[in-house]
Amino acid sequence: METRKPAERLALPYSLRTAPLGVPGTLPGLPRRDPLRVALRLDAACWEWARSGCARGWQYLPVPLDSAFEPAFLRKRNERERQRVRCVNEGYARLRDHLPRELADKRLSKVETLRAAIDYIKHLQELLERQAWGLEGAAGAVPQRRAECNSDGESKASSAPSPSSEPEEGGS
């Protein structure tokens, strides 16, 4: 318990409590506070030592990041992060709803969900190209094959066949 009278304790704003050492107007006799708001009892001998050659490289007390440790700030930050994670998870759930039914029974990770969605989209594109080729093929036009890109970052040689792809049709 503190033995000082309330008049002896002076609560200064944090910006004044982190003033450079040895600057006129600073009050080294006042109890300093750390970022967790616990009073630090430093007598005049400690302040002299801090100003001496032992601490030549340190001209300032450590500046506390006051707002980053406030409970309200932490609660708001954590709630924003929880909301962001909820939205991301909801997006993955909606994406899984659009995948073929054979994948609905499996528990897919986020990466597996993205890869399955990419494979399924490629499969649907191939079906559309085949359908377009079938319609235009009767008229004698040859469909132009667009350049293939691997948007999932894997090389073409390492990509496995799509779990949602249909078996190739037999010969003509």
UniProtKB/Swiss-Prot annotation:
Gene3D superfamilies attached to this UniProt entry: Helix-loop-helix DNA-binding domain
An MF annotation (GO) of this entry: protein dimerization activity
Domain bHLH: residue ranges: 72-124
Low complexity bias locations: 156-165
Keywords noted in UniProt: DNA-binding, Nucleus, Transcription, Transcription regulation
GO cellular component: chromatin; RNA polymerase II transcription regulator complex
Classification via Pfam families: HLH (PF00010)
Tissues with expression: Expressed in skin. 7-fold higher expression in fetal skin than in adult skin. Weak expression also detected in fetal lung, aorta and brain, and in adult stomach, kidney, ovary and breast.
Keyword flag Transport: no
Keyword Nucleus in annotation: yes
Location of this chain's protein in the cell: Nucleus
Disordered: region residues: 144-172
One Gene Ontology term from the biological process aspect of the record: regulation of transcription by RNA polymerase II
PANTHER family for this protein: BASIC HELIX-LOOP-HELIX TRANSCRIPTION FACTOR, TWIST, BHLH DOMAIN-CONTAINING PROTEIN
Described function: Could be a transcriptional regulator involved in skin development.
Name under which the protein is recorded: Achaete-scute homolog 4
Gene source species: Homo sapiens
